[in-house]
Amino acid sequence: MYSIRKVFFLFIILSPFLAYGNLESLSNDLSLKALKESEKDIDTAMLLSQQSVVADPKNAKAWAIAGKIYLLNKDLSSAERFYAKAREIDPFLKDVKDLESLIDNEKKEE
């Protein structure tokens, strides 16, 4: 599923940021990169989204974006878990409400 090279590459790239950078900013950047990557490579997008929530576990937007990416991969149960965490952090965030709608639509299609 995930190649060792991709994981190693992401670790090497992220290590300096995790040590010295603003974790919320890093989390947001990773989330945006994950969304962009989801158009080309869903596995890399999922890795980036996981890194975004690790970088800042209190970032509701990162959890919501990760949920969207997992939903794109047709992993409804993971998307729901990401949604639950995002809602727990900030239930009023637009990204959280958007993810809720996407999940509801996916359930209706099943």
Where do the model's predicted regions map?
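Register position in tetratricopeptide repeats
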Residues: 39, 72, 102-109
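TPR alpha-solenoid repeat register
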Residues: 62, 95-96
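Alpha-helical tetratricopeptide repeat
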Residues: 24-35, 60, 64
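Conserved structural position within tetratricopeptide repeats
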Residues: 51-54, 85-88
